[in-house]
A protein has these predicted regions:
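S-adenosylmethionine
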Residues: 1-442
Length: 442
């Protein structure tokens, strides 16, 4: 979307409106299609895609914005007449006028299934999620109907912009001086209430970046686990596009400068299983399969060595690293707030193939870490097939691995689950739905 806005030379209010129309329509698409179906003699899937997309934009303006109804209908009909044709514009006009007779709150009881008879279907239509995703999130969050509704509603909120100040290169104080606000959890985070993040000098100079708080905390948790002996060789096995690698690289070089947890010297055992702050002096190897993503990692990091390699079949010797990060490819169901189109593009049939890849990457990471070293397995998805099932399967197969309680290395955050894994949630923490498992090689 940002690239398209630049191409069309839209900025300021026009860019904001275009972004809201596009992302807002994508978030509400499932609900809007049910309403369109109720106002038409044709099912949405039978309507030509360009015409249907224009009507969806009009419905979003009618039901979720302050655009006057006559303006929403008129501009949409004009767009259809210009891009599709006169006949299609008459159809769009008829549908939108019917939609405009009720508010969203009035439409929902009409188009959504009865919650007593079909709670999953009711939530899917009311909160505009595919049914399979609602089922998967229900299984993962383990909450009641009200909590599920809160989670799905949070997926439809615009995410706040969170910045990360990379230690040794920037500071939270610098970000605050640039107009950001204090963050809740990560000691390196600040919230940007408005404006373009690229206009922040530290971001423009790659000393800071946009990074969700949960993503930052996953990195911090890995660096806080006490490791006996040497602690100078770190690996990011799936480093592209570089968000976690950028923070890992900075902490590896400069250490955890926040002072929120006890500091240990590099290679010194803290004598405790609790979180301790790394003091610096490590080297990061950032591995990425795709060349263009490896280039992004190279641009993001300062001191890391970046290699293009298949993480499931690495060239290095087993046991070469003290700490390993596995930010595994996943469905991204934890980031639906910032990628509203993903809920409609993802297919549950991809889960078996993804699961095999995730298991292969975690196995490779555990082979790559030395005995006594630690592996962080993270996904931006709470789907149990990508999280607990993957880690549990590996733990059953291998007797040289133990799961640590990831929550104990994140003392800033409550509500991360029953352990030993940590699960962030949009409705509880205001972050992406990031999952973390910490595993020590025996």
């Amino acid at each position: 979307m940002p690239a398209l806005l630049r191409e069309r030379r839209l900025s300021g209010r026009d860019a904001g409106l275009a972004t809201e129309l596009a992302y807002g329509t994508l978030r509400g698409l499932g609900t809007y299609d049910e309403i369109i179906a109720a106002c038409s003699d044709r099912a949405p899937e039978k309507v030509d895609p360009p015409l249907l997309d224009a009507i969806r934009l009009g419905v979003h303006q009618l039901l979720k914005t302050r655009v006057p109804p006559h303006a929403a209908v008129g501009t949409t009909v004009d767009l259809v007449r210009l891009r599709v044709g006169i006949g299609a514009s008459k159809y769009a006009n008829a549908v939108l006028r019917k939609v405009s007779t009720r508010s969203l709150e009035q439409w929902l009881p009409i188009v959504a299934p009865d919650p007593a008879e079909d709670p999953i279907g009711h939530l899917a239509v009311t909160h505009s999620h595919p049914r399979w995703i609602v089922t998967a999130l229900r299984d993962a969050v383990g909450g009641d109907f009200d909590e599920m509704a809160a989670l799905l509603a949070a997926d439809n909120e615009r995410p706040r912009v969170t910045l990360v100040a990379r230690p040794g290169r920037s500071s939270v104080e610098e970000l605050l001086a640039s107009g950001a606000e204090p963050a809740q959890y990560s000691p390196y985070a600040a919230y940007l209430p408005e404006g373009d993040p690229g206009a922040v000098l530290a971001v423009a100079e790659s000393r800071a970046a946009v990074q969700d708080e949960a993503s930052q905390l996953v990195v911090l948790a890995l660096t806080r686990v006490p490791v006996e002996g040497a602690d100078s060789r770190w690996l990011d096995l799936c480093a592209g596009p570089g968000g976690k690698a950028g923070l890992l690289d900075a902490i590896a070089t400069h250490g955890d400068e926040t002072g929120r947890v006890p500091v240990r010297a590099s290679g010194e055992h803290a004598g405790s299983s609790g979180p301790v702050a790394f003091s610096g002096g490590a080297n990061l190897l950032a591995a990425e399969l795709q060349y263009h993503r490896a280039r992004l990692v190279w641009q993001t990091t300062r001191n890391a060595s970046v290699v293009t390699v298949d993480g499931t079949a690495p060239a290095w010797r087993p046991g070469s690293f003290d700490r390993v990060m596995v930010d595994a490819p996943c469905t991204g169901l934890g980031a639906l707030r910032r990628r509203p189109e993903a809920r409609w593009r993802r297919d549950p049939r991809s889960l078996p193939e993804l699961g095999r890849l995730q298991r292969d990457l975690l196995t490779s990471a555990l082979d790559s870490v030395r005995p006594g070293g630690v592996v962080a397995y993270a996904t931006c998805s709470p789907h149990l097939a990508e999280t607990a099932a993957v880690v549990g399967d590996i733990l059953r197969r291998r007797d040289d691995v133990e799961a640590l309680d990831a929550r104990s290395y994140l003392p800033e955050v409550d509500g991360l689950g029953e352990g030993p894994y940590a699960q962030f949630w949009p409705h509880r923490h205001g972050t992406d739905g990031m999952f973390l498992a910490l595993l020590r090689r025996r």
